[in-house]
């Protein structure tokens, strides 16, 4: 089998509600869709992030991909191992989109789901968390009023999706964030595990001041309160709860450094930010060897990427925390199979060959036109 064409499409898909965090507010998701065609008539699909810059890198690499056997995934990754060195995160994103499409091709060629190719199923359904964040209707609220409103949102999510874990998107105001967490705990009477993710917007001093209150709650983990492994290690010395990160462990040599410092307990993996499914599995093996835990980060994936994360979680034993997903916030998608319907706190792993999902051509064209008109979302 040989690659004959590499097509790249950038899409904008609106969110059903503006999504706010300490980083800012988004109303649209921009994603990059990769389609790899072969001389045997099979097509593999992939998805990644960073829109047009990522698409440009993939298009630049495409001439070197034509004629390559897409089933030799490890060789392909080695061929382009310097891409992240020159392009950073966007380079990882480009490789991830290409590699994901190759895994999809391998599954279709062998008529096997991706999870089987990764070693088989550890689990058939993946526990997911639900996201609580400040919405437009909360504008002007603060203090206990905002905390009560967010607690109401969290309770509604638990009742509708039956999730066992809630994640609060934090802010630059740790006092308000912890007040919100306490309101969630009270509303749910400790029946649901909680996470808070300020995206490193807190200071070390603020975090240390908030720890005694957070430690009274049913915490799943505290995610990226501060930036950098040294700062996280300082927090970890005082924290009687797991610390998680996707912002301070971003490349392979960060993992042993985090281990030596005792900085974190849970590494949040992301196939797009680690350069593909194979590198993510290598990360899992490293974490397991070092005694670290692991879960899956969410960065506004659509259905193709969500399917990839579900398969990775299905085949990776060490992933022992509920997976984050923002697919439930999307107004639409670009695949035929609806993956966003969380029931019983879980998402099923797609069962077809490869990723187990198919592109809806009409939706792809529609959302590509939105990107052509508006450009990449911020």
Model-derived segments and their meaning:
Residues 44, 126-130, 164-168, 194-198, ...:
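Hydrophobic faces of well-ordered beta-strands that scaffold small-molecule active sites
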Residues 329-378:
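C-terminal extensions of enzymes
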Residues 1-45, 328-334:
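Structured beta-strand/loop patches that form or line metal/cofactor-binding pockets in enzymes
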Residues 55-62, 95, 99, 103-104, ...:
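Predominant activation on well-ordered alpha-helical scaffold segments within soluble catalytic domains
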Residues 3, 34, 41, 61, ...:
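Conserved, mostly hydrophobic/aromatic
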Residues 119-239:
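Metal-dependent enolase-superfamily TIM-barrel catalytic cores that perform enediolate-based chemistry
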Residues 56, 68, 212, 218, ...:
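Shared catalytic-loop signature of beta/alpha-barrel
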Residues 36-110:
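Metal- or metallocofactor-binding catalytic centers and their adjacent structured scaffolds
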């Amino acid at each position: 089998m040989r690659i004959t064409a590499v097509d790249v499409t950038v899409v904008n898909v609106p969110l059903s509600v503006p999504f706010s965090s300490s980083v800012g507010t988004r109303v649209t998701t921009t994603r990059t869709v990769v389609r790899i065609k072969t001389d045997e008539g099979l097509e593999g699909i992939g998805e990644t992030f960073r829109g047009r810059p990522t698409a440009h890198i993939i298009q630049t690499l495409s001439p070197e991909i034509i004629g390559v056997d897409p089933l030799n995934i490890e060789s392909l990754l080695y061929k382009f191992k310097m891409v992240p060195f020159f392009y950073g995160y966007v380079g990882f994103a480009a490789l991830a989109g290409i590699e994901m499409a190759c895994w999809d091709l391998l599954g279709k060629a062998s008529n096997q789901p991706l999870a089987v190719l990764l070693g088989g199923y550890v689990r058939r359904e993946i526990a997911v968390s639900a996201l609580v964040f400040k919405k437009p209707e909360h504008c002007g609220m603060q203090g206990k009023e905002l905390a009560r409103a967010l607690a109401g949102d969290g309770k509604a999510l638990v009742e509708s999706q039956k999730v066992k874990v809630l994640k609060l998107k934090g802010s630059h105001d740790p006092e308000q964030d912890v007040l919100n967490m306490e309101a969630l705990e009270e509303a749910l009477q400790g029946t649901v595990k909680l996470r808070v993710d300020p995206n490193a917007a807190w200071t070390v001093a603020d975090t240390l001041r908030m720890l005694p209150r957070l430690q009274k709650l049913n915490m799943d983990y505290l995610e990226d309160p501060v930036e950098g492994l040294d700062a996280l290690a300082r927090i970890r010395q005082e924290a009687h709860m797991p610390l998680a990160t996707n912002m301070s462990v971003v490349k392979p040599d960060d993992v042993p450094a985090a281990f030596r410092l005792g900085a974190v307990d849970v590494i949040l993996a992301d196939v797009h930010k680690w350069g593909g499914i194979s590198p993510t599995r290598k990360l899992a093996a490293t974490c397991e060897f070092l005694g670290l835990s692991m879960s899956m980060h969410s960065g506004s994936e659509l259905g193709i990427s969500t399917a990839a994360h579900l398969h990775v979680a299905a085949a990776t034993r060490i992933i022992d925390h509920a997976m984050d997903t923002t697919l439930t916030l999307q107004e639409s998608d670009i695949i035929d199979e609806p993956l966003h319907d969380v029931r019983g706190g879980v998402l099923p792993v797609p069962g077809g060959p490869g990723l187990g999902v198919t592109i809806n051509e009409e939706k792809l064209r529609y959302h590509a036109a939105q990107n052509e008109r508006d450009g990449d979302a911020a």
